[in-house]
């Protein structure tokens, strides 16, 4: 059985693959020029909403999980525009998104960050879109 975080990453990646050829569910993917443009889907921070616990401590856990979707490409002076176009596509694909096996999960767009790096005559850029998904998992009631 896989953890819900893995299921969420896989479902988001499946949705993104409808528009992007190179989508990976890890931030540890080594990318080469032939992999560009690429999209990385990974999770960062997860917190539990303690105030929603049942009084006996065995109710469903309400989890807030941050999902990073990082679009990476190579370009010249058009790189900002290329990254913004990728971000717009990602936002459109995830607007109103529902996870097939977790209909109670709520996905919210949180933030965007960009970064660029120059290596010789190549400019590498990334735009990271962070989403928060709130979902529930059951605990085992010992009573």
Residue ranges and their predicted role:
Residues 1-35, 45-143:
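Charged, amphipathic alpha-helical segments and their flanking helix caps
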Residues 37-41:
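A short glycine-rich, His/Asp/Glu-containing loop-to-beta-strand
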């Amino acid at each position: 059985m896989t953890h819900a975080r893995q299921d969420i990453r896989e479902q988001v990646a499946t949705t993104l693959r409808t528009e992007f050829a190179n989508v990976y569910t890890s931030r540890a993917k080594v990318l080469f020029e032939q992999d560009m443009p690429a999209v990385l889907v990974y999770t960062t921070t997860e917190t539990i909403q303690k105030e929603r616990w049942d009084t006996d401590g065995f109710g469903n856990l309400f989890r807030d999980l941050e999902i990073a979707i990082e679009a990476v490409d190579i370009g010249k002076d058009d790189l900002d525009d290329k990254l913004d176009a990728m971000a717009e596509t990602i936002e459109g694909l995830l607007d109103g998104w529902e996870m097939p096996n977790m209909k109670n999960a709520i996905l919210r767009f949180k933030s965007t960050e960009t970064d660029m790096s120059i290596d010789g005559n190549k400019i590498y850029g990334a735009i990271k879109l962070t989403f928060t998904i709130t979902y529930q998992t059951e605990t085992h009631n010992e009573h």
